[in-house]
């Protein structure tokens, strides 16, 4: 049998004749600047910030990101292929799924890109808050899609990537240039002062081979 009682701000549990005491969080005085473990926040090691040239290089070198949408009750995060033209990021979205509705409901998002070595001796990541807009101009859409075709070929990506872009893996990559099975999104309204780029201590991301 378990009998629980409250005495002088402590919780006592009587089990098999033994008394266990758990100090209530309300009975432990907290000092300003200290967390619940008693470690002063001033002692916490902070990861180094990335310079603009560093996170620009990270964005240029990678091609997979995560986009966080506002969602309903919870935020919704989805992975995307992207291309970067040195100024803007573009994404190819299949025309189905919750991400499409979340984009229509609220185009304000945060894009996250990361790089890390298998043993985490090197790692870095950057988050970019901004606004997604859908590209409607036919010429611009084709230009961006052609760059995605080039990305998939140059990175030697599996045909399975086509299934994430609204196409069958059995289709040639050039099928991205035909039909309306996907949409082109562009990240805009990114303010440099809102970009957060962090890296591991002494990390220097290596360019992919």
PLM regions and their residue ranges:
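Short beta-strand segments
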Residues: 62-95, 111-112
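Short, basic/aromatic recognition patches
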Residues: 39-66
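Short, solvent-exposed aromatic-acidic interface loops
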Residues: 94-98, 149-152
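Helix-adjacent hinge/juxtasegments
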Residues: 98-106, 110-133
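Short hydrophobic targeting helices and cationic amphipathic motifs
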Residues: 13-15, 27
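Charged, gly/pro-rich active-site loop segments
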Residues: 26-33, 38-39, 44, 122-209
């Amino acid at each position: 049998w378990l009998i629980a009682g409250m005495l002088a701000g402590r919780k006592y549990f009587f089990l098999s004749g033994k008394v266990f005491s758990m100090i209530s969080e309300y009975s432990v005085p907290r000092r300003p600047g200290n967390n619940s473990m008693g470690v002063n926040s001033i002692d916490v090691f902070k990861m180094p910030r990335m310079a603009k040239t560093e996170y620009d290089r990270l964005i240029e070198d990678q091609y997979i990101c995560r986009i966080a949408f506002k969602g309903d009750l919870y935020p919704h995060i989805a992975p995307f292929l992207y291309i970067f033209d040195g100024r803007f990021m573009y994404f190819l979205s299949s025309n189905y799924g919750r991400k499409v509705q979340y984009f229509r409901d609220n185009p304000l998002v945060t894009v996250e890109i990361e790089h890390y070595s298998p043993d985490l001796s090197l790692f870095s990541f950057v988050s970019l808050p901004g606004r997604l807009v859908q590209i409607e101009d036919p010429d611009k859409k084709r230009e961006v899609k052609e760059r995605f075709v080039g990305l998939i070929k140059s990175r030697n990506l599996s045909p399975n990537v086509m299934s994430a872009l609204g196409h069958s893996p059995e289709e040639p990559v050039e099928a991205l240039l035909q039909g309306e099975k996907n949409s082109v999104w562009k990240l805009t309204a990114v303010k440099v002062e809102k970009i957060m780029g962090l890296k591991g201590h002494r990390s220097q991301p290596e360019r992919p081979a």
